[in-house]
From Swiss-Prot:
Entry protein name: Probable transcriptional regulatory protein Rpic_2388
Organism: Ralstonia pickettii (strain 12J)
Gene Ontology MF, one: DNA binding
Domain of life: Bacteria
Coiled coil: none
Length: 241
């Protein structure tokens, strides 16, 4: 299946992540803690914990930090009790935005997220107002030059739904979220290391922004992403060059 260019966006995302590693560690510690609390401290039987631990390792987080977060989650250490909350809303020009949070203070978080939407012309909607515009998937992005046929064989055998070839030569493997850990392990065993591997809300259609609208929409997304309680921001907005 063919698709449009992804590689520049992936490289930008990785560079941005490297630039705010301290914040990423904080988010990952929260995610590890919640994953361990909900599914137990054994990563082999807890796919969500395995994914969070893999992300933490990729972000160069020390093992001690990871283990402490797991212990906090299973009740071995004291710490904040985080609650998962999803907010949905619209940016300018009807672009859909999903904001996933982990918080120990729902009142604070909803006020900050609402302010983020309002500040740059967006508005926060009700639960379910935009989620139907996205698909919940596991996603793996591979660099241009990755052998397509071999990757496709390994991915489909592992249980992936699709392999997409983008115009820039990068490859995208899509799988059901509940099979993410299994597919990731199988691909790595076959010698394929993804540049980006995550469970996401993927937009079914996109809204392309250019000029001043692009600047304004990017500012809205940046404000939301920089909130302390925000774990992930998903949008169907595509910011043009």
């Amino acid at each position: 299946m063919a698709g449009h260019s992804k590689w520049a966006n992936i490289k930008h995302k990785k560079a941005a992540a490297d630039a705010k590693r301290g914040k990423i560690w904080t988010r990952l510690i929260k995610e590890i803690t919640v994953a361990a609390r909900l599914g137990g401290g054994d990563a082999d039987s807890n796919p969500r914990l395995r994914l969070a631990m893999d992300k933490a390792t990729d972000a160069n987080m020390p093992k001690d930090n990871i283990n402490r977060a797991i212990q906090r989650g299973v009740g071995g250490l004291e710490g904040a009790n985080y609650e998962e909350i999803r907010y949905e809303g619209y940016g300018i020009n009807g672009a859909a935005v999903i904001v996933d949070c982990l918080t120990d203070n729902r009142t604070r978080t909803v006020a900050e997220v609402r302010h983020g939407f309002d500040k740059y012309g967006g508005n926060m909607g009700t639960s379910g107002s935009v989620a139907f515009l996205f698909d919940h998937i596991g996603q793996f992005i591979f660099a241009p030059g990755t052998p397509e046929d071999k990757l496709m064989d390994a991915a489909l055998e592992a249980g992936a739904d699709d392999v997409i070839t983008h115009d820039d030569g990068s490859l995208e493997v899509i799988c059901p979220p509940h099979d993410f850990a299994k597919v990731k392990t199988a691909l790595e065993a076959a010698g394929f290391k993804a540049e980006l591997a995550e469970v996401i809300m993927k937009p079914q259609t996109e809204v392309v922004f250019t000029g001043e609208d692009a600047v304004k929409m990017q500012k809205l997304l940046d404000v939301l992403e920089n909130l302390d309680d925000v774990q992930e921001v998903f949008t169907n907005a595509v910011i043009g060059e």
